Amino acid sequence: MRPALEMYMTPVIGVVCFAIIIASWFGGVRYFKGIPAGLVAIAVGMLIAWGSAFMGFSYGGMSLEKLTSSFSSFGFSIPIPAFGHVFSGFEFLAIILVTAIPFGIYNLVEAIDNVESASAAGDSFPTTRVLTADGAISLVGCLMGNPFILAVYIGHPGWKAIGGRIGYSAATGIMVILLSWLGIIAVMMSLIPIVAIAPILLYIGMLIGAQAFQETPKSHAPAVILTLVPHVAAWGKLQIDNALAVAGTSAATVGFDKLGQVGILYQGLETLGGGAILTSLVLGSLAVFLIEREFSKAAAFAPVGAVMTFFGFMHGEHIGFAQSPSVALSYLIVAFVLYGCKYASYAPKPAEIHEHHIGPLSRWTNRD
């Protein structure tokens, strides 16, 4: 969502660059002797931003003062081992685990999802090796003082569609090392308007969203939509919290009843959006198994949701005991209901029409 919002905050750059990108990547337009559309968009964005700055409009927030001051970060610096900081952090372990466990699960699921996404685009990678490399390199980074874990980057079909291959990953790694060690990132940030890059991220998101529908059975579309709902709730709550925090208050201070009077069901957003990643997995699995008339498997996922909800991994802001007991109880009741459906009469599963194979990603995977 943020890339789209950034585009329309500075539409003279964002919308124009977005048009340049989708004209090439969706419309097949070729630019100036094969120059990549992303590079053309960034160049046009820089031209508009700096041109407007010299004319006094300052679209994109570029200025010579910022660019000049950014050169002060130039210099050669390499990561220094930080073993002491790593182990001294154990005194904060209880606080860290509240975030680390859900985030670790998210990173695992995201890596598996992205490997599957690559497979759907025609490139198969060994999942175990990918996850092992992901974890091992993250550990090395932590010992060097890096608080950010390595992640299998999202959007393989999109990068492949614009011509990215193994050299793209290698070049990215080399560039990140050079930019970081030489202190060039600040200069790049002061030279290139962020809004010129945002359309690329929006395009990747569009392609990933489309793939979720194109590469799954048509009958599973409702399940895909259902998995998005907890994330929308989490996003909505975050926007409300940040807005109230800037105003120096909070939802509890304002009052849930007052928020409800203007249509903001804050407690509902809080419950539904808590642990959105795991919630989406459970709800999506329930929906898929129900669509497939596999009631026993659907019923098996409900107790899983109950346990994770009880301990705060789902539908809660904190890990602990009895975080959302009423929601946990509802999942247990759902388990009995779904298991009972196994013995009820029900309509046969609709015949699947594999229309999703007409998409471009499917054509890649089905070519002889």
Predicted ranges, named:
Residues 137, 141-197, 203-204:
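Long, well-ordered mid-to-C-terminal structural blocks that present hydrophobic/aromatic surfaces
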Residues 32-42, 77-86, 113-115, 120, ...:
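Hydrophobic alpha-helical transmembrane segments
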Residues 1-55, 179-325:
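Membrane-embedded alpha-helical modules
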Residues 324-337:
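Small-residue-rich transmembrane alpha-helices that serve as helix-helix interface/gating elements
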Residues 93-166, 357-365:
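Membrane-embedded helical hairpins/re-entrant loop segments and their flanking transmembrane helices
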Residues 57-84, 243-271, 336, 340-368:
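Intrinsically disordered, low-complexity non-transmembrane regions of multi-pass membrane transporters
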Residues 49-56, 68-114, 269-281, 329-332:
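Hydrophobic, membrane-embedded alpha-helices of multi-pass small-molecule transporters
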Residues 42-43, 103-107, 131-139, 173-177, ...:
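Transmembrane helix-bundle signature of multi-pass membrane transporters/permeases
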